[in-house]
Amino acid sequence: MDHEDMIKVDASVRERCGTGSARALRARGLIPAVIYGKNRDPINISLSQVDFLKKCRTFPIFSKLIELCIGEKKEYVITKDIQKHPVSGAIAHVDFQFVDQDAEMKMEVPLVFLNEQKCVGVKRGGVINILHRSLIIRCSPHHIPKSLEVDLIDVAIGHSLHVSDLKLPSTINVVMKEEDPVIATVVASGGGISEDAEEAAPASDIPEAGK
């Protein structure tokens, strides 16, 4: 286990919950948060607004393993959700998920599309249709990618890019419902979508945390 590769965050157990208690914490510069997970009771905690916001700006907060120091106890978690105030942008609440460091976990990772304007098909008047903007993967908590790159440069009109065409890290496995789904296709302008794309109309691939 490489502790140097983790984000370390100090936290405190909060005894009281509810809107009033959360408002009081925020007034003191603290963020109300919760840790939850399979076969574990949730733990309500608070953490420093300034410290956690700095971590969010410094690290890929949704793809880095976090060591939460709660008094003398340590919990290993990943960030599942961050709620922000709609006006001030201050962090209003954070959801963390317990992590078993020795077990693989299932999660959704965004796709980053490269060379859209340089794409062969686009240069010849085609239009890119993106079928999936994220993938469901299974991997160790120590190898969660921030994102996965999809290079569109060589996709011609009438051609599609499948998951099997991507250069993916050896540390992850894609676990989508479809077998080798189409990620993107290039069609002639005004020419509809390809047969591959029709078959690959994205289903609801919502991951079950930790499965």
UniProtKB/Swiss-Prot annotation:
Protein name, entry field: Large ribosomal subunit protein bL25
Alphabetical list of HAMAP family matching this protein: Ribosomal_bL25_CTC (MF_01334)
InterPro entries with a match to the protein in the record: Rbsml_bL25/Gln-tRNA_synth_N, Ribosomal_bL25/Gln-tRNA_synth, Ribosomal_bL25_b-dom, Ribosomal_bL25_C, Ribosomal_bL25_long, Ribosomal_L25_dom, Ribosomal_uL5_bac-type
GO biological process, one term: translation
Source organism per UniProt: Anaplasma phagocytophilum (strain HZ)
Cited function: This is one of the proteins that binds to the 5S RNA in the ribosome where it forms part of the central protuberance.
Superkingdom of this protein's organism: Bacteria
Gene Ontology terms for molecular function: 5S rRNA binding; structural constituent of ribosome
SS bonds (residue pairs): none
Key words of the record: Ribonucleoprotein, Ribosomal protein, RNA-binding, rRNA-binding
Subunit structure: Part of the 50S ribosomal subunit; part of the 5S rRNA/L5/L18/L25 subcomplex. Contacts the 5S rRNA. Binds to the 5S rRNA independently of L5 and L18.
Similarity annotation: Belongs to the bacterial ribosomal protein bL25 family. CTC subfamily.
GO CC terms, sorted: cytosolic large ribosomal subunit
